[in-house]
Amino acid sequence: MHILLSNDDGIHAPGIQQLAEALRTLAFVQIVAPDRDRSGVSNSLTLDAPLRMQTHPNGDIAILSGTPTDCVYLGVNALMRPGPDIVVSGINAGPNLGDDVIYSGTVAAAMEGRHLGYPALAVSLNGTRHFATAAAVTCRLLRALTSTPLRTGKILNVNVPDLPLSSLKGYKVTRCGSRHPASEVIRQTDPRGREMLWIGPPAGSFDAGADTDFDAVNRGYVSLTPLQVDLTASAALPVLSDWLGDTEGLGSW
């Protein structure tokens, strides 16, 4: 098995390095990751400038100023030969639960892998201590996927409680919960007297029901949430069609 491994915390982050070490006991692993922290950049691609790479002595490749999506795109289409069998993103230092998946570069890297036709996992730890737990969980999932392929055509978003491996209660299949809308803005003044604005932390959970990713992780379970590239709100299509049929004033051609 050949694994393309990326993240959004940067190539030197402990999460990706510990995950690479664990995965290399199972398969060939090629890291292609940003050279710095690119958290929160979602699915952005760099289209207004060339991208340069730096190959480390161990073969890991850093994309200078690249986004997670850049890294997976370049890894699949130019840098990894033979190509990957699966794309893995993580381990993120912090969860990607509920609305987090909209902004997450970790999820975006997996999304790009799936968009390019590969199975893909995004792995996040609900904290910053037990990366070894998340790495072990990822290895177990990959062994299971190898023996029994998951033919959903979806991205698997994995959130792991920040606990010792022996303290995990198991796995739960979940849906994305949701957070309250974030509103905090932190105002500061730089040394030259100019105002600076920092976007504050995410808000707390709003929908954390029994079948959500929030609830599973809070109760000590690994959360497994299938995600998809297609953002069409299928249930809203007939509502929109009825609205269009009943609406006047849009004009005709």
UniProtKB/Swiss-Prot annotation:
- UniProt KW keywords: Cytoplasm, Hydrolase, Metal-binding, Nucleotide-binding
EC class name: hydrolase
Provide the cofactor list for this protein. Answer: a divalent metal cation
What EC number(s) has UniProt assigned to this enzyme?
3.1.3.5, 3.1.3.6, 3.6.1.11
Keyword Cytoplasm among record annotations: yes
Coiled-coil regions in this chain?
A: none
Tell me the residue numbers annotated for binding a divalent metal cation. D8, D9, S39, N92
- Tell me the cofactor note: Binds 1 divalent metal cation per subunit.
Sorted alphabetically, the Gene Ontology cellular component annotations on this record are: cytoplasm
Q: Which GO terms describe its molecular function?
A: 3'-nucleotidase activity; 5'-nucleotidase activity; exopolyphosphatase activity; metal ion binding; nucleotide binding
Please give the InterPro entries that the UniProt record associates with this protein: SurE, SurE-like_Pase/nucleotidase, SurE-like_sf
Q: Which SUPFAM superfamilies match?
A: SurE-like
Please give one Pfam family short name.
SurE
Q: Which reaction does it catalyse?
A: a ribonucleoside 5'-phosphate + H2O = a ribonucleoside + phosphate; a ribonucleoside 3'-phosphate + H2O = a ribonucleoside + phosphate; [phosphate](n) + H2O = [phosphate](n-1) + phosphate + H(+)
- Similarity comment text for this entry: Belongs to the SurE nucleotidase family.
Q: What does this protein do?
A: Nucleotidase with a broad substrate specificity as it can dephosphorylate various ribo- and deoxyribonucleoside 5'-monophosphates and ribonucleoside 3'-monophosphates with highest affinity to 3'-AMP. Also hydrolyzes polyphosphate (exopolyphosphatase activity) with the preference for short-chain-length substrates (P20-25). Might be involved in the regulation of dNTP and NTP pools, and in the turnover of 3'-mononucleotides produced by numerous intracellular RNases (T1, T2, and F) during the degradation of various RNAs.
Q: What is this protein called?
A: 5'/3'-nucleotidase SurE
What species is given as this protein's source?
Answer: Sodalis glossinidius (strain morsitans)
